[in-house]
Amino acid sequence: MSLDELRDRAALYALIAAGSVIGGCARYLVGVAQLSLLGTDFPWATLFVNVTGSFVIGFYAAIAGPDGRLFASSRQRQFVMTGICGGYTTFSGFSLETFQLLRTGHALAALINLGVSPMSWLVAVWLGHLVATRLNRLKGT
């Protein structure tokens, strides 16, 4: 890999990281607002960021895509979609990928993704919790 390629790659990673900082801070602020306005009875902040982030990634993918009205370079798309939306949501990439499957006529794959992904996430959370709980019970340091 040449030095120019390394610089280009490093610049892309820096853009994605900067977008992630913006998205992550925005998500945190939504969470703080939710706690003070709505309390802790329901995860409104997560619902809000996932819905709004899914809207933003879908909108930006269309408006800045090859047939879109807005010219955006690959780096700009990565900054917004991978960085900001990825840092802001826990759901936008999954939503976009599932929508793309539906839009391109792969309804069965989209349905499988809708069923398998959330269940896998829940199982993974459960397993992670189980492993950590058992580790916490071990004696010693």
UniProtKB/Swiss-Prot annotation:
GO cellular component terms, alphabetically, are:
plasma membrane
Q: Does the keyword Lipid biosynthesis apply?
A: no
- Principal localization reads membrane
Localization, UniProt = Cell inner membrane
Recorded catalytic reaction(s): these are:
fluoride(in) = fluoride(out)
Q: Name one GO molecular function term.
A: metal ion binding
GO biological process terms held by the UniProt record: cellular detoxification of fluoride
**What's the domain of life for this entry?**
Bacteria
Residues spanning the membrane? 12-32, 44-64, 79-99, 107-127
Q: Which PANTHER family match?
A: FLUORIDE EXPORT PROTEIN 1-RELATED
The entry assigns this protein to a family as follows: Belongs to the fluoride channel Fluc/FEX (TC 1.A.43) family.
Its function, per the record, reads:
Fluoride-specific ion channel. Important for reducing fluoride concentration in the cell, thus reducing its toxicity.
Mind telling me what this protein is named? Fluoride-specific ion channel FluC 1
Name the source organism. Answer: Rhodopseudomonas palustris (strain BisB18)
Q: Which gene encodes it?
A: fluC1
